Amino acid sequence: MPAADDGTPAALAGRVVLVTGAAGGLGATAAHACARAGAIVVLLGRKVPKLNRVYDAIVNDPAGLPEPVNYPFDLAGAGYDDHAELAMRIQAQLGRLDGVLHCAADFAGLTPLEHTDPAAFARALHVDLTARWWLTQACLPMLRQAGDSAVVFVVDDTVPGAAYRGAYGIAQQAQLALLATLHAELAASPVRVSALRPGPMRTPLRARAYVEDQDLRARDPARYAEACVRLLAPQGAVHRGQVWAPAP
């Protein structure tokens, strides 16, 4: 069993965790942190070469981490049946699922709603809200089988009604409603739901709205990787039903 530096069992030892957007800024570093914490990580993302880099970083870690599983998947184009098939494949290959970390997001850049491309609006709303729910819904039967499991939504710090964020900004607020509803409905179940609201991070997504060398507030996403692990681990129970905004 993987152990922490002090010899105690690692926080996610024996668990299987699905990370969406696993090749992205936060997703990649969070996936590696989950593996360091003892989890078998299912790496979900669109681009195979980028997923392979995350996979290689984990399997080549000198600590000898559990081997992850690559699952190329396009959230924007997948139907609900594709999400259900993903859940069935995890069940067949790994036999369990203990956590889902939603890092994948779609944001085309700052644009007035009036001038937003209709297809881009629909895509962002789907990836940032509908696909997150579809995947959660498909995985709930497996998550219920675990004695303790977690669904974690990574949300932005976008102020409600902030201009030019388009469907991305709207989806951020809708996710909070989804979180509250799921928390109420799953209160008596072993499935915990919570959200992580990291501070500004230096990621390709944020670069679509800010000039990097002028974005003095942004931090390395690695600063929030351990927060992801905490919410997925049993210790995350203290944040059940909440939006956690840890200090960087």
List PLM regions with ranges.
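Rossmann-fold scaffold of SDR-type NAD(P)-dependent oxidoreductases
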Residues: 20, 97-105, 128, 153, ...
